[in-house]
Structure formats: structure tokens, C-alpha cells
């Protein structure tokens, strides 16, 4: 009987993942989903959503849902390329070509680090370099020595 709740919880996780994987229908990274599970094009492709979904799909893969490993890899690749500012470092809040892609925030960078470090712990290709980039950017651009915070 103790296995019952665990099985029920994993069934719920599987339903959530089935819904969440629809975010991969976006052309860039992962898209914002409507409550119906379709991409909501009112929102630009963002670092935040891409990082959150990368984290989620990596956790899913770690839980044994191996079919989500490729989505975790997709997220790491998008964060490392499309959302990365090759000229000035760091990560754009939204993908270039969508709104003001020049904006950057510590919040977005923290989510990139969360996604990257989780992916790194699961051996996702490209995650090591993404961790290094996110961590160095957080400390070089957002760390406030005078306050001891980001």
C-alpha cells in the first residue's frame, strides 16, 4: 500500500509534463502556454520561461522520464546561443528581434544558473559552460559588494 501515493504522484507529474512539453512548439526556446496548452504569442520568447522549462525537463529526466532529456538539451542550447549576448555578455531577457532584447536582469540570470546547474548535475551537454557563463555574469554584473547581494 505505501507505493500507492508515490504512483499517484508520478501519474500527476506525467500529466503536468505532457502539458508542459507543448511549450516546445515555440520556434525559440520554450514558449508561454495558455491555459489551453497552446503557445501564447502575446509573449516574446523569454530567458525566464526557457530557463524554467529547461529546469523542469531536466528534473523530469532525473525522475526517469527520459523522453524529456532532449527538451532539457534544447533549453540549454537555446540559453547558450539565442538568449546569450555574444557582444557584451550575459543573457537577454527576451530573444533578439522580439521587443526590447537589450534588457537583462539578475532575476533572469539566476534562473539560467538554476537551469544550467540542474542540467549539469544530470550530464546535459553544454550545461558545464552555461553554468560558468551564468555564474561569472551574475558576479561580474549584478553582485553588490556594498550590500552583499545580487
Question: Which residues fall in each region the model found?
Answer:
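Glycan-recognition and catalytic cores of secretory/periplasmic carbohydrate-active enzymes
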Residues: 1-150
Amino acid at each position: 500500500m505505501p507505493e500507492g501515493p508515490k504512483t499517484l504522484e508520478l501519474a500527476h507529474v506525467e500529466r503536468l509534463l505532457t502539458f508542459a512539453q507543448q511549450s516546445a512548439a515555440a520556434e525559440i526556446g520554450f514558449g508561454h502556454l495558455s491555459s489551453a496548452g497552446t503557445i501564447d504569442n502575446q509573449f516574446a520568447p523569454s530567458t525566464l520561461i526557457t530557463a524554467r522549462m529547461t529546469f523542469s525537463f531536466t528534473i523530469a529526466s532525473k525522475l526517469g522520464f527520459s523522453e524529456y532529456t532532449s527538451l532539457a538539451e534544447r533549453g540549454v542550447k537555446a540559453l547558450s546561443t539565442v538568449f546569450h549576448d555574444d557582444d557584451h555578455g550575459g543573457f537577454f531577457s527576451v530573444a533578439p528581434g522580439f521587443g526590447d532584447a537589450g534588457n537583462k536582469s539578475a532575476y533572469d540570470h539566476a534562473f539560467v544558473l538554476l537551469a544550467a546547474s540542474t542540467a549539469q548535475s544530470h550530464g546535459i551537454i553544454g550545461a558545464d559552460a552555461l553554468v560558468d557563463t551564468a555564474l561569472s555574469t551574475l558576479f561580474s554584473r549584478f553582485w553588490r559588494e556594498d550590500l552583499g547581494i545580487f
